[in-house]
Amino acid sequence: MTDRVKNMLAILKKRDYRKLRSFGVRNVTEETRGLNSYDRRAKLLELAFAAEVPSLYGGDDIFGFNRTTTAVPRDDEVTDWGFGNVILDFEKLLSTGLDGIKAEAEAELTDATGEERDFLCGVIKSLAACDGIIERYRVRAEIDGRKGLAAALGQVPKRGARSYYEALLTLKFMVYALRLNRNVHTPLGRFDQYMKPYYELSKNVGATDEEIKELTELFFISLNFDTDIYLGVQTGDNGQSMVLGGMTPDGEDGANALTEICLAASEELKLIDPKINLRVNERTPISVYERGTRLTKQGLGFPQYMNDDVVIPALMAWGYDERDARNYAVAACWEFIMSGNAADIPNAASLNFPLSVERATKKLGECRDFDEFTELVKHEVKAQVDELTRQHLEHLDNPDLDPFVSAFVGDCIRNKKDVRRGGAKYNNYGMHGAGLSNAADAVTAIKVKVFDEKSVTPDELNAAIEANFEGFSELRNALIACPKTGNNDALPDGIMRELAYAFADALKGKTTPFGGVWRAGTGSAMEYVNAAAVVGATADGRKAGEYYACSFSPSLTARLSGPLSAVQSFTSFDLAPVCNGGPFTIEIHDAVFRNAEGEKKTAALVKAFIDRGGHQIQINAINRDKLLDAQAHPENYPNLIVRVWGWSGYFAELDKKYQDHVIKRAEFNFG
């Protein structure tokens, strides 16, 4: 770690820079009154930039574009936040700059009419709104004697980048601008692919890999300065995901020198951003998994691994072109999205699997056999899907427009349509599937106790559930002892498959407003807490309100025989129909990583999951005793990081309900 990196890391961790910020929200509704929707969004971006004061953190801040306001201007006519979970066309941005994209929009004006013209003018005005803050930062850099930064800002981001540093500076500006444009969850996409040409440009004029690594580390640090402002559900849920490796659009292996530089930078810095994702396949050598495990060992909760062999065919089955499918990345958490040409909403809704089982269980007495009950559960899954898709389409009937983001999403300018109005090539939606393992375990328990053993009647089971198992502890223990997903048991694993496929089938034929499809997934996001809160006790022995499993993982009440059995369970069926995203999530005791043998076993476990057809996996290196102490004494653990669902955050900054869930997850050792 160089001195420059150490200095910036110290500034980040001290957090004194936060004292430079101004607070409060300015209402600018009167200033935008009378403007059309496109011009209003452009004006709001201009006003947000105008409120910022160029600020550089110490003598080694080579990027700037740090937030000095904690809130963007408010407009009562703007009903929602900007578009999120979209990957921009970074290749075009880096090669042509803002001015090149603006010129493209100006050229399209020649034959534009009506709303097309309004849209293109909104794009042009949004891009022009960037000029002032760029120039003010350039002047500030000159005054402060930052010759390198000042010179770079004379070129980028208005024009194309000529070096690795200028490309990084363009990216930092875009992160800053997108947040001021009200966009949330703006991932960084396939960083080692679109940055490779600029790495090579710098190498060709004498830059060393150590110098490139230093720039990369300084860039990574810069992404962490304002994460307390860029909130999702919790601090850390900010969408700064980065994808490394994987197949190129031409079908070649995309891993390159930058892949390793990024992994090394993340390992050395030990920060929550950017969240690293590795694309792999059945041909990936064990050495890659061992390299990833060294990063997991740091307790960062990443890398997350994605299986090209499963994901690419699944995306093609949903209608994505092969080249585009090969170029997939991830959204803020783990949803699979396209790079630079899509307006997909991969987290549009969330199915509550145990809710469907709860509704079916109330009618259990009407079922003559288990097959009838299974069909009833599937019917309830479909009914819930029907309602969720209907509600969502009503909610998104007239979303706010976003000409700024539209400028960087392929086809929008050429089609003369906003990204929120079908301008992009792809407009698909995704639906999460929360509590899948809990639902499968509950259905399994009903089969075993009600239909096979006949040791409990439907009325007795429903009475126990209604009572939240108060006075029914013996029955609850018997339900908990029933077979569970995660133990390589064909019964619950087969039921899990049936429920997953029922979900996928229920979404077939559903369309989005712009002709897209709905994609089923195995993720839960925060619904493992929120959705669980509205469902009563369930037949797996879970009490009312108790948390579900996180995404695609064994339930919290499952007694598991070991990590390999869990891997076998969750790779026991073809995951392509439910490949919207949602990782197999597993917790391994941090003691495992104290020797080389434990690291090798962890790497082998991840490889086994991928080789068996798993779609996505993430690992937490945790220590329950340490987490309990951190919960009691947060001041002693300011830098303790955990994987929450699709993102990593500082444990001490999480709400207690999310802390509790991480603590309750199974903690594996290798025998």
Regions found by a protein language model. Name each.
Residues 1-122, 148-158, 163-671:
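Conserved catalytic cores of very large enzyme subunits
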Residues 144-145:
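A conserved hydrophobic secondary-structure block that centers on an alpha-helix together
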